[in-house]
Amino acid sequence: MLERLSQITSHTRASTAPVADHPLDPLSAAEIKAAAAIVKAAYPDKNLTFNVISLADPRKSEFLAWSAAPEKTSVPAREVDIVALEAGVSGVWEGLLDLTAGKVLSFELVTGVQPILTIDDLSKVERVIRSVPSVIEQCVISGISADEMDKVYCDPWTIGYDERFGTERRLQQAIMYYRSDEDDSQYSHPLDFCPIFDTETLEVIAIDIPNVRRPVSKAKHANFHAKAVEELGGYRTDVKPIIVQQPEGVSFKVSGREIEWQNFKLHVGFNYREGIVLNNITYNDHGEVRPLFYRISLAEMVVPYGCPDHPHQRKHAFDLGEYGGGYMTNSLALGCDCKGVIHYMDAAFPDRNGEPITVKNAICIHEEDDGVLFKHSDFRDNYATSVLARGVKLIISQIFTAANYEYMVYWIFHMDGTIQLEIKLTGILNTYAINDGEETGGFGTRVYPGVIAHNHQHLFSLRINPMIDGVENSIQMVDAAVSAAPVGSKENFYGNAFFPKATVFKTVNDAITDYEGATSRSWDMINPKKIHPYSGKPASYKLVSHETPLLLPKEGSLVWKRAGFARHTVHVTPYVDRQFYPAGKYVPQTSGEPSRGLPEWIGDGTGNIENTDVVLWHTFGLTHFPAPEDFPIMPAEPMSLLLRPRNFFLQNPALDVPPSYIMTTSGAKKLGESVVVESLTDKVSRLAFGETSAEKLAESSCCSK
Ligand code: ABN
Ligand code: CU
């Protein structure tokens, strides 16, 4: 039970708060410091450590009022979410500060919950367990000598939930490995036991030991460092460099954290949990600035593993809610994580003492070639009449490391008004020990001698607060449907009639829906009051998403209960300020009884979601049956979804993108065989082989016929 003990509210001091550029900006390092100082001054007698000091998003109505008339409206107050721990006290201190006023608005102890694990919390486990006698004993049983404990490593995971230990203590499970050399990849040498670690007392409180023992593998480590590749024959020598050139720099403008690019304008937020947050996205449609989305972010994810043997049921990481997509974010390297001309944004987080830590280059913003945007040629004059425009895309990205896995998150803006989310998975499989000849049971794949990688899913929750031409929107599900009229009937004589069947959701219950590939199902975020003059249909952005596996853990299972958001592809709820976390605010060690987050907000499902401010929660991802090709390090596996304008623009909004080649029929007749449209020519592309004379190049160029 979540028990709230109301404590002190409203402690005031003179404000010395630094001023932010924009109400949606994440807290700066100076603001984090100032927020920590307010808390420390208010509660000098408490021995507090900080878990979260993060912007509490402004209330939407206040933000929109300010944004519509910034000169006339006061800036929304900077409010700050605090999660702090007090030594020896179970539960978390949850605070809300008004940073502008230098004031504590609320500070209360929430019991029966556990906060996110920070990198600091994770780092303790390995350091401590190496000298714990019961762990050393298990290592020796596994075939590692007691004086080799510096070669023993662990990936610390939150325990998830284990009914033996409940939620009282802050627990981590140590997923154990061995390296014969510090440069080894430990994942080819998993150990078969799992210590349970108390994060606060630094004690190992239990060790899960399997009935069948699996000594540490005697195989060579499966490494991916240069020496290992050398032993396999060395790096390939036939890869020629590809250099990205942007001689005139970038096509986007940056003002603070606001980006303008190709008619789009948006604010790039970032927080410890969701990582990148895209705020207040608008599109300048020939002078009319049209709102598209108020806020889009990755709100949660769950990675359930499919091996039924204890304790593997505990492997179902909520990487955002339990560890934080911001806290785990990488500092990105120029020419490496992103190529071309890059603009970076840093991220600032608190350490346990409330001192700011800055992650340099946490967000990468850059452009890439986007292939052909549109093309048509007329066969009548041997394709001389032709147009071809190439696209450019804007990419806002981050990469976070969730212990073994890397998640690469790309928010991509296209010139036709489409917004895409692409996530690529790389890094290393979570592995476990398997004896020679031992059956996998089908629940995993032997990816290397002595190594099994269990089946699992990566299910993400995308939170979309649409604002299609205004705050009042509806959601409709669209299915390809065939005419009900039989073949031979007047209405469908040839039997070929089909059409898009749109179902507008009225209530929260209506909107609980799953993907249906056979009907090309999609979901439109519509403004029912904005009707397109040609199509007669409402202005919309369509969610096109096909990688939508169902949650495989069964109804009633621990994962099903804890990850309520993942039970369906789409949920829609009425908008509520600061309702961000679909598996609950405090995810570690929730039992799922009751299911937190979305299931609570759904309630009896009768809430109105028609023609109002709504939030669409979309579950997407993939089911991963590991293969040896995923090991020892996984080639990046992409998944992608689109938000596409439909009945929103009068016509193709990218018609004004300068084409690489354009020729009319009359122009082709007049100019004859060889035409170069000088100003648009790509001067860098050239033939790979053979003739390189100027004439030959011109003949094969897209700019000549
Ligand atoms: N994938 C589970 C996890 C994530 C981050 C840190 C530790 C473990
Ligand atoms: Cu995977």
Per-region residue spans from a language model:
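Short, non-transmembrane alpha-helical segments in secretory-pathway proteins
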Residues: 23-67, 118-158
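Extended effector regions of multi-domain proteins
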Residues: 2-12, 99-104, 108-117, 140-141, ...
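Exposed beta-strand-loop-beta-strand "reactive/processing" segments of non-cytosolic proteins
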Residues: 45-99, 147-199, 262, 396
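Terminal targeting/leader modules
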Residues: 2-27, 33-48, 63-70, 78-81, ...
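Hydrophobic or amphipathic alpha-helical targeting/insertion segments
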Residues: 89-90, 95-123, 127, 131
